[in-house]
Amino acid sequence: MKKRMMIATTAAFMAWWILVCIPASALAQAATPADSVKDAAAAADDATDSMLPHFGDARPFYVSGQINVIFQTHPAFHADYSGQNSFGPHYEKATSRIMTLYTGVRVSHSTEVLLDIEDAAGQGMSNSLGLAGYSNLDVVRIPGEGSPLSTAPYLARAMLHQVIRLSSRNAESDRGYMTTFAELPARRIEIRAGLLDTVDVFDQNSVGSDSHFQFMNWSTAQNGAYDYAADTRGYTWGVVTEYHDGRYAFRAGEMLEPKIANGIDMEWNLRKAHAENFEFEVRTKLLPKKEGVVRLLSYINHANMGIYRDAVANFKAGLTPLPEITDHPQQLTVKYGFGVNIEQALPANLRAFARWGWNNGKTESWAYTEIDSTFVVGIRADGRQWHRKKDRAGAAFASNAISKDHQNYLHDGGLGFLIGDGGPGFLRPSGNLNYGREQDMEYYYTAHLWRGLYAGPDLQHVNNPGYNRDRGPILIPGFRIHMEL
């Protein structure tokens, strides 16, 4: 039944697109018969990369969309024991599907409104639990078993984007879900206010930030130690200001936090919860004649977060039957962290990236995942090397860790919102955690099949799932189909 609903919804989405977009595109082409050679070439490239025609760059509006389907499975693996939030040791398979409609309208030469509608269906293996670096980034949008989230389409982004010109010179800009502008001032201030994904702006990386074409693992596609403000689906309300000046950029954002860890309801009272995010970016050449980017990230979260050490102390004092991170009075605690994000062009159409992240690890994991420190390194190869210019292949290694306080909490049977091999009825005299760093290796290939249709395999190998040496390793093969509409 669920599969039939997914197919029906997908078909309806594509039918709507054809009815709305193709006539409008035809009208746009008829109204501008004197398109330049450059515009015609760009239109040809666009037709190659998308399933359906798009409006020209000169149009003050933007309409696009995407469909991303990920299938994953894993064979049975060794596990000395399992708990309430464990990744299941028996054979599993699961499919997720995300569809997004991107829209934008330019209301002046410097102001635009962007609005996206999204629909999510399917599921993740083991109800999307048991791995700190979970294998499918798309499942953050999908209601799990027992989730209060609606299965209906939802508003994903709704933001006002204001550009303040500081120079007469322009720079090219890619029209997309974050802007309708084909050009922006080379030196400028940008202000975004509304509903967005924090990592739409912060911790971006052209090699490892897109589960539609690149890596799927949570700790590879994003900085796992960046516990950025977000609701259950990964979105939040906030204001972001950016300053761009050629090689340099600086951005700062004030975001709403959820009322509870990984919750859908946001706390609008800033005296009870809020998050500050800062990032400095410099474009440099770490290698001669090869462009690179270095981004330095910091963030501070203020929310009603529990403290691991207090939860363990209450358990050992007999005040709770097991460590319970949510068993505390209303309080305002602080989590802070830092990150480094590097990408570098290499010879032979290769591009490498690396991330390092750390947070203080004293308070409960709140909005993204249960990682307190991380290191990731990866590489992408462009298909030009084998005469498939639109194809991509990549490999990455991620090593994730948690603080000692976090380890003690899980060892004594405590549960986070994602991991924990303990829980009620699962407590073991010797403890529920034989700690080891969770390590993920991922390989993918994305083949361009036709116009906006892409597909390819993915393979992940996970050591110490949920930071537990008593479980795993796990082999997770997968397959992705993606359509740019």
What is each PLM-predicted segment?
Residues 69, 105-107, 117, 162-164, ...:
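Residue-level signature of outer-membrane beta-barrel architecture
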Residues 36, 218-342, 349-352, 356-363, ...:
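Signature for the C-terminal beta-barrel architecture of outer-membrane proteins
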Residues 59, 93-99, 151-156, 233-237, ...:
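Residues that define the transmembrane beta-barrel architecture of outer-membrane proteins
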Residues 281, 297-332, 353, 364-462:
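Outer membrane beta-barrel transmembrane domains
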